[in-house]
Amino acid sequence: MIIGITGGIGSGKTTLSNLLRSNGYPVYDTDKEARRLQNEDDKLIAETKALFGENIYVNGELDRKTVASIVFSQPELLTQLSSIVHPVVKNDIIQWASSFTSNKLIFIESAVLFEGGFDVFTDKIILVTASEEIRIARVIKRDGMTKEQIIARIKNQIPDAVKAQKSDLVINTDQGLPENTLQSIIIWQH
C-alpha cells in the first residue's frame, strides 16, 4: 500500500516523514529526489538549461535559489519547470515503488502531490496542516526566508481546504505532531 503525505510549506510533512522513517517505513521525498534528478538526469539538465540558460547550473549543481526567485515571481515559468520535472520524478517513483512487495506500507511525501499528479500512485492520502501564521514562523526559522517569499510559495499551492476534500486523513500540527500519530496511521490504513 502506498500512502501519500502532502501539505503546504511548513505544515509538518517532513516531521511526519522523519517519524515514519525512524520507525522503518520507506518514504520517497519528491522534493529531495527532484533536486537529485535535476543534477543527475542529463535530459532534465538540458531541458532546465534551455528554460533558464546555461548559467543556472553552477559547478554542476542547479542554482535552486535563483530558480526559486524566478519561478515564484513568474508563474508561467513554474508551470514550464514543473512540466519537465514531474514526469521524470514520476518515472523515478515507479522504479522506487517497484522495489517493495505489494504488502509493504510505503509513503510518498510531496507538497505538490496533487499538482504534480503524484497522487495517482497512492492508495490513501494524508494531509498535514497548520495555520498559515505557524507555517510562516516555522519556515522563517528553518530556512531564513522572508514572509513575502513564503507567501508567494503558499499562493502557488492548492489551498488546504481543497486538499482536505481529496485526502483520507487530516493531521493538524499547530501544536506539533500529535503524540499518537504513528499508531493512528497504522490503525487507520488497515
Annotated model-derived regions:
Residues 3-5:
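Hydrophobic anchor at the beta1->P-loop junction of P-loop NTPases
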Residues 8, 20:
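P-loop (Walker A) phosphate-binding loop of NTP-binding proteins
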Residues 11:
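ATP-binding Walker
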Residues 14:
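Walker A/P-loop
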Residues 35-101:
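ATP-dependent small-molecule kinase phosphotransfer cores
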Residues 92-100, 105-141:
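ATP-dependent NMP and nucleoside kinases share a basic, alpha-helical "lid"
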Residues 93, 120-121, 132, 141, ...:
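Small-molecule kinase domains that catalyze NTP-dependent phosphoryl transfer to phosphate-bearing small molecules
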